[in-house]
Amino acid sequence: MVRVTLTASAGVMLEADGLRFLVDALHSEGEYPFSRVPEKLLAEMDTGRGPFCNADYLVFTHDHPDHYTPQVVERYLRHNRVRRVLLPRVQWADRETELLRYLAEEAIPWWRLGMPRGTAHSYQLQPGVFLTAIGMQHTGAGFAELDCDCIVLQVNGKNFLFTADCDYLRREAYSFAKGLPWEAVFVNPYFYHSGTGQVLLRDVLQPKHIVVYHIPFAGEDPMGLRALAHQDQVKYAASLPQTVFLTEYLQQSTWD
């Protein structure tokens, strides 16, 4: 069984083969035009009970406030036990001072991701479970100097690809994905909307499932991404693999 649950924006919990991964799922800061993880969910995590508590792995693609808040990660770790934390490359080192101190004090295992652009590194998380971080350019002209990790999770033979904010205009950057059997590929609305993104999804990645995420909640969407996603859902549904659009708080998608 595979289940995906939205926390907010590009934050999801992936459940596969009895393991739970929180990917970009712990953030609540900044003035970005994307939804924060609601305080009521963070408070539930503080109880140490419920579906989001005691996740196996915390994974972060890059150090942007709509993907990663060190203080929220530390808060989570004070109330929950995890096997390992996989941190992004930092843009502002002082953001992590307290988190790194807590990781050291509590001897919580962690690794630093954030691969240089065009390089990749694989980590074995446990037998049969691997994470590969692939350094890519961040999408958007205003962020072209920044990098973002494209994350591959391999869970006992099932392959999941999290593209987060990785650039999708250079098809060759995804040559690593050609021919792999993808259980699910996670893309943002701009990736899904673009012609190059469509080619990647249809001809290169060819996943069983497409998950479109990084969509603001209703009332928190100044850029109109919800309307764009709805338009594209109608336009492309028949020509692409099974697609789910994560637009609502705690929305889930489950499949065998």
Regions found by a protein language model. Name each.
Residues 184-203:
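A short, conserved beta-to-alpha structural element at the edge of catalytic cores
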Residues 36-92, 178-186, 206:
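Active-site metal-binding motif and surrounding structural segment of the metallo-beta-lactamase
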Residues 76, 147-149, 172-176, 197-201, ...:
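A general structural detector for well-ordered alpha-helical segments in enzyme core domains, enriched
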Residues 23-24, 54-66, 86-89, 161-166, ...:
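Active-site neighborhood of phospho(di)ester-bond hydrolases with catalytic His/Asp-centered motifs
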Residues 99-129, 176, 199-256:
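Binuclear metal-ion centers of metallo-dependent hydrolases, dominated by the metallo-beta-lactamase
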Residues 1-53, 110-180, 248-256:
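Core dinuclear metal-dependent hydrolase active-site scaffold
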Residues 10, 29-30, 63-70, 92-95, ...:
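Active-site environment of divalent metal-dependent phosphoester hydrolases
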